[in-house]
């Protein structure tokens, strides 16, 4: 194969994620949807809350930050509520990834990728 002078690699440009961050004060438990921001800063507002992930969709991900001002926890669960995946304490965040969807006959394709301590400023 001869070299034709064209670069065989395409260098990707920076990817922007408009609407990718959302901060919310919860008044009760929260069920996520696929049109929610992928990065969510949630304040429990005085009481621990349950967060139900969106219906499984292969390749979906969400990063949830517990931005509560006191020791209040977020319990993150599968979309069908069957399994708790993580408890995110104050000043922690959880990164979740979905590797299955309804086509795979899965109601619980979400996985915890990382539980990360954060510093809020």
Region locations from a protein language model:
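Tight coil/turn sites that cap or link beta-strands
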Residues: 37, 89-93
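Cytosolic nucleotide-binding catalytic cores of signal-transduction proteins
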Residues: 96
